[in-house]
A protein has these predicted regions:
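Positively charged n-region of N-terminal signal peptides that target proteins for export
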Residues: 1-4
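Sec-dependent N-terminal signal peptides
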Residues: 6-12
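C-terminal motif of bacterial Sec signal peptides marking the signal peptidase cleavage site
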Residues: 16-19
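Acidic/polar, low-complexity intrinsically disordered N-terminal segments immediately downstream
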Residues: 21-120, 126-161
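Ser/Thr/Gly/Pro-rich, low-complexity flexible regions
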Residues: 142-272
């Protein structure tokens, strides 16, 4: 079991300028009908988890081949309505791509890249007679990010030592379809973005400046700390679950502050 121990806590400021049969077909050997099951998995850098996704195709011993078709969700719904499920299965075989590596009991991953919006991927299993006998679909939503501005992210001392620099130039982006969802792009390296959500709750700092509270869920920075493994970051509120530690905010000029917690899965970095 992994253990997540309260590690280093520090305040990091990111200053931005505003200018910017039920079981049949599921077991190996002797299956009478082709069967397919699909699952999706998140991808890791250098792939982009906001726009790239992986489909795992699992088939049984009666499956001779499998075909996959990726469509916009609206097109998928239209084709299902027009053709029905069986007709759509034939449509996938005719218009989709052959899943390479599928023959009999198989487990194969297929990657899709650079998607924006809502998509459906459908896989159809075909038997040795060329009959489409089973289908399964999975959905994926690719995020469109709009640039807000350029800025500089400042690391706390311990992380600056690991990064080899005190700050990094970066950009602040907002989700085109969710104005409360933000990311600081590539802050810990290519593909390692710091994402946060703007809360409705507001407050003022000691100087009377108004800000919106923000929430930073736990994520992997892609960094390692000595022999303790992968370094994770979250805000103190997300890490503890206590509102006593909610101390993150974004101002109208897009400058922001985060009460950060860095932790590892094999032990503590240091005690606060």
């Amino acid at each position: 079991m992994k253990k997540y121990i309260f590690g280093l806590m520090a305040v990091a400021a990111a200053m931005f300028m505003a200018s910017c049969s039920a079981d049949e077909g599921t077991e190996p050997g002797g299956d009478s009908k082709a069967y397919v099951m699909t699952n999706t998995y998140s991808v890791a850098p250098p792939l982009d988890a906001d726009a790239d996704f992986k489909v795992r195709v699992s088939t049984n011993s009666a499956t001779e081949s499998a075909y996959i078709l990726l469509e916009k969700h609206a097109d998928y719904s239209k084709h299902i309505a027009e053709l029905g499920q069986e007709g759509y299965n034939d449509f996938v075989v005719k218009n989709g791509g052959l899943v390479k590596g599928v023959k009999g009991q198989s487990e194969v991953d297929t990657l899709f890249y650079g998607l924006k919006g809502d998509y459906m991927a459908t896989v159809v299993a075909v038997n040795a007679k060329g009959q489409a006998q089973a289908a399964d679909s999975v959905s994926f939503t690719g995020i469109t990010w709009n640039k807000v501005c350029d800025g500089k992210y400042k690391f706390c001392a311990a992380i600056a030592d690991i990064m080899g620099k005190e700050s990094v130039d970066c950009e602040l982006d907002v989700d085109a379809n969710n104005p409360s969802s933000y990311r600081i792009k590539d802050v810990y390296g290519h593909g390692y973005n710091l994402k946060f959500r703007k809360a409705k709750l507001t407050s003022t700092d000691e100087e009377g400046n108004a800000f919106n509270y923000i929430i930073v869920p736990k994520f992997s920075t892609g960094l390692t700390y000595k022999t303790l493994g992968t370094l994770y970051m979250a805000d103190a509120y997300s890490f503890t679950g206590s509102e006593d530690y909610l101390d993150n905010g974004i101002y109208a000029d897009n400058s922001l502050f985060i009460y950060t917690v860095y932790s590892v899965s094999k032990g503590a970095i240091s005690q606060p």
